Design a protein with these regions (language model features):
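A generic short alpha-helical patch detector that favors 3-5-residue windows
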Residues: 31-35, 148
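Von Willebrand factor type A / integrin I
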Residues: 64-68, 85-170
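Von Willebrand factor
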Residues: 35-70, 82-84, 108-111
């Protein structure tokens, strides 16, 4: 909402793309107060129809739907990985960054960044319900987990900002 108000105050067009495992809603960029209020209302009322996350699908949609170069923001926890813990969106991110001025705002809980050494832990994906075991006693596993999202953003040459979910900014 803050980004939308800021863009509107600058007399820029504002649009929104809501996604889960698919693109759920696209509001094309426009100017005007009523359009801005529609985006805010949709943001407050949005309830995903599907579980999961597919960041690459959203980035491909952005790249195809918006033909002219634009400033765009991706707000996500970036927890969209394959079985080898590689981001599923790596290629789509590189393409979107090359086409648009894309900034990634990585929202996270600080407890997600530092995995404590407590041995085998069963974790559950909040979106899909899938469960798996993680060996937190492995230093390599902890280091890999702590560094992967930063490395992907750096490699894609995307401007990144990290927001802690426990902080209130407004």
């Amino acid at each position: 909402a803050v980004l939308a108000f800021s863009a509107s105050a600058n007399n820029d067009k504002v649009g929104a793309l809501f996604f889960s495992s698919k693109v759920e809603k696209f509001i094309p960029p426009k100017k005007g107060r009523s359009h801005l209020l529609r985006i805010i209302r949709e943001l407050l009322e949005f309830k995903p129809q599907t579980q999961g996350t597919d960041i690459s699908e959203a980035l491909r949609f952005l790249t195809n739907a918006i033909k002219r170069k634009c400033t765009a923001f991706l707000l996500s926890d970036l927890m969209d990985v394959d079985q080898q813990s590689r981001p599923n969106y790596e290629e789509a991110l590189k393409i979107a960054v090359n086409r648009h001025d894309l900034s990634v705002i990585n929202i996270y809980d600080p407890r997600e960044r530092e995995i404590p050494d407590v041995g085998l832990v069963r974790v559950r994906d909040a979106e899909t319900g899938e469960q798996l075991w993680v060996d937190t006693s492995s230093k390599a596993v902890r280091e890999h987990y702590n560094n992967w999202s930063t490395g992907v953003l750096r490699e894609a040459k995307s401007l990144a900002c990290h927001l802690l979910s426990e902080k209130i900014f407004i």
